[in-house]
Amino acid sequence: MIFGYARVSTDDQNLSLQIDALTHYGIDKLFQEKVTGAKKDRPQLEEMINLLREGDSVVIYKLDRISRSTKHLIELSELFEELSVNFISIQDNVDTSTSMGRFFFRVMASLAELERDIIIERTNSGLKAARVRGKKGGRPSKGKLSIDLALKMYDSKEYSIRQILDASKLSKTTFYRYLNKRNA
């Protein structure tokens, strides 16, 4: 099945040009919406994706009509590849059923992987530099006073667990972790 997807960003824009091009291409089913590209909630796109099966094709007028960012476009292309769905952009001359179209998207996927690796390297470098400066990652410790208070309240058997947690500002998990550690 050949699915067409058309989108405009504002109410002032018109879907006619896209719909005409998609109809001329020979789509079987059209999905259209009027939402900004930055908006994550795109029900028509989601509905189309849920209907996709192996061997189907997704046809768009231009790449910027389906994707709000390069990252999102790469995510979609990876999804289409996983589903064995062809992806065609009429204006951009992209067709993943051809070797050049597949190459184009593999380059995009490689760039996405490179970007992810760079982010990981930067994060690890930042954490290492922080450790060298004496900074410690993770959540701040709950403090001995809170823990001691909670355990004393528990030992008194005068308070419910809820009252102990509220007074000590400890989570249930943290409280029981310290209680079990003490009783071990």
UniProtKB/Swiss-Prot annotation:
Membrane-crossing segments per the record: none
Gene3D superfamilies in the cross-refs: Resolvase, N-terminal catalytic domain (3.40.50.1390)
Keywords: DNA integration, DNA recombination, DNA-binding, Plasmid, Transposable element
Protein name stated in the entry: Transposon Tn917 resolvase
Keyword DNA-binding: yes
Active site: S9
Family the entry assigns: Belongs to the site-specific recombinase resolvase family.
GO MF entries: DNA binding; DNA strand exchange activity
Organism: Enterococcus faecalis (Streptococcus faecalis)
